[in-house]
Design a protein with these regions (language model features):
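Conserved strand-turn element in the central/C-terminal portion of the radical SAM core barrel
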Residues: 1, 212, 266-271, 275-277, ...
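Radical SAM [4Fe-4S] cluster-binding motif and immediate context
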Residues: 126-299, 319
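Radical SAM enzyme core and accessory elements
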Residues: 8-11, 17, 105, 341, ...
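Structural detector of well-ordered beta-strand residues that form the stable sheet scaffold
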Residues: 48-50, 73, 235, 299, ...
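Acidic, low-complexity intrinsically disordered segments
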Residues: 1-190, 199, 456
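Catalytic cores of alpha/beta
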Residues: 60-65, 247, 308-323
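Conserved acidic residues
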Residues: 17, 70, 203, 257, ...
């Protein structure tokens, strides 16, 4: 069907009192296209529009300029949205609702303060019945599973400079004196898991936490005891330095099927200086031996195209991944999202204007550098797993496959066929198999989606 017709018909049929749009930065322009399609109904019926999410939080001056956006939610939106709806329902003025920037008919903007943190243990469960059932199916390990995200943590205790967590912490500390990072109670997590499993027949769980193993020992033990009753395979992501044999052994016994590590870059000095990730390569390699030893399948996520990076530095990332030998290795283009420390670095270096909107990190590079061109970055990305899996004696051919020429494309196609034949495992076991059954390499589509949203919280 035509989405433009669908959205226009929905607006006419539903006749909303408010249109709310939660958007990450790379989805912002699509959101504006949607608003463009409903502008006639918006103007005719005087329907206010609010936009929220991490992009609106960290680029409010930019977002509020758009003609069809009347309000911006800065920070968490659960309480602010409820307060706004209550005011609209009663026909009351809502220009002073906390967390909101409200634009009047003359274009004047009232910027309200941020209120205290939302109690994430009081939030209602996600109403999955609002969505078509096919929205619950996602790829994992070469199979399609019925799964949903379950939030266990909000925010992150670490300060990676490509991520919004440092600025999120700074914002809430300055405005409210509070730490944005917190953990949902185990009872609340259990209630949500039990509800989703019993009411919607879920087959797989993925935990929505930037660093799942930010749990301390007591909390992890509580989780494992709680999860015995759920008994579904699950996926989580964490940092290498949080891993121990004891932790992963406990999680494996209750259903840990797959996990992902954020490696990001292979050069120790560059990783520390540019990314604020202070760990030695030898320690990362040792940490990644733990899931391999236990038979837990894992993927490693890396990024390339950082400011001041070079092709040689990118090969340090390839070399480290080669030593780790994960079941799956993903690489993404650096995305200088608003609200990240590296966005400021990128602008200071003159590589982006403050108004530039960053696209998806699986898209072509927006940061154009003479020493490491977009074409080189794209070439490294497409041959990344080939460099990792094939012996170095094949690197000469792989380098040719980096080029997007007739010859390069031909060589890449041949190498890809060989790669799939030698290194691509069979799909995972069925949804009804025991959670401790053998596991295999996943299709990385799902994990790419999770990685993309690591840096961007929703409204």
């Amino acid at each position: 069907s035509d989405w433009k017709v669908d959205i226009a018909n929905q607006i006419k049929r539903f006749q909303p009192d408010l249109v709310a749009m939660s958007s990450t930065e790379d989805m912002w322009e699509l959101g504006m296209r949607v608003l463009e399609e409903i502008k006639d109904e918006k103007i005719k019926n005087k329907i206010p529009v609010i936009a929220g999410g991490v992009f609106a939080t960290f680029a409010p001056e930019l977002c509020i300029k758009y003609p069809y956006v009347d309000m911006i939610c800065v920070g968490e939106g659960e309480k602010a949205l409820v307060d706004l709806c209550k005011r609209i329902e009663k026909g009351e003025d809502y220009s002073d609702v906390t967390n909101l920037w409200v634009k009047d008919d003359d274009g004047e903007i009232k910027k309200n303060k941020i209120s205290k943190l939302v109690d994430i243990n009081s939030n209602p469960k996600i109403d999955l019945s609002l969505f078509e059932e096919n929205r619950l199916y996602r790829p994992m390990a070469g199979k399609i599973w019925k799964m949903v995200p379950v939030e266990t943590h909000r925010g992150c205790p670490y300060t990676c400079r490509f991520c919004n967590s440092p600025d999120q912490q700074r914002l809430y500390n300055q405005e409210t004196g509070s730490s944005f990072f917190r953990k949902k109670s185990m009872q609340k997590v259990y209630e949500e898991l039990k509800h989703f499993k019993d009411e919607f027949g879920l087959e797989y769980i993925y935990f929505w936490a930037d660093t799942f193993l930010a749990y301390n020992k007591r909390e992890l033990d509580e989780f494992c005891e709680m999860y015995k009753d759920i008994n579904l395979p699950f996926w989580m992501q964490t940092r290498p330095e949080t891993v121990t044999v004891e932790k992963l052994s406990k999680l494996q016994k209750v259903g840990l099927r797959r996990m992902a590590f954020g490696l990001e870059h292979g050069n120790e000095q560059f990783r520390e200086k540019m990314l604020d990730r202070r760990w030695k390569n030898k320690d990362i390699i040792e940490a990644c031996k733990v899931p391999k030893k236990l038979g837990i399948q894992f993927s490693v996520n890396s990024i390339t195209g950082f400011p001041n990076e070079t092709r040689d530095l990118a090969f340090d990332t390839i070399e480290l991944n080669k030593h780790i030998d994960a079941d799956n290795a993903n690489i993404y283009t650096f995305a200088p999202f608003h609200g990240t420390p590296l966005r400021k670095v990128t602008e200071k270096l003159g590589l982006l204007t403050p108004e530039a909107i960053t696209k998806c990190l699986t898209d072509t590079p927006q940061v154009v550098m003479p020493q490491y061109t977009p074409e080189e970055i794209e070439g490294i990305k497409r041959t990344f797993v080939l460099y990792i899996k094939f012996p170095k004696s094949r690197w000469k051919d792989i380098k040719k496959a980096e080029k997007f020429t007739d010859e390069g494309n031909k060589i890449y196609k041949e190498l890809r066929i060989e790669f799939l034949d030698k290194y691509m495992p069979k799909p995972d076991s069925s949804p009804t198999s025991n959670v401790n059954d053998e596991v295999v390499l996943p299709n990385n589509t799902f994990e790419q989606g999770v990685e993309k949203n690591r840096y961007q919280d929703e409204l």
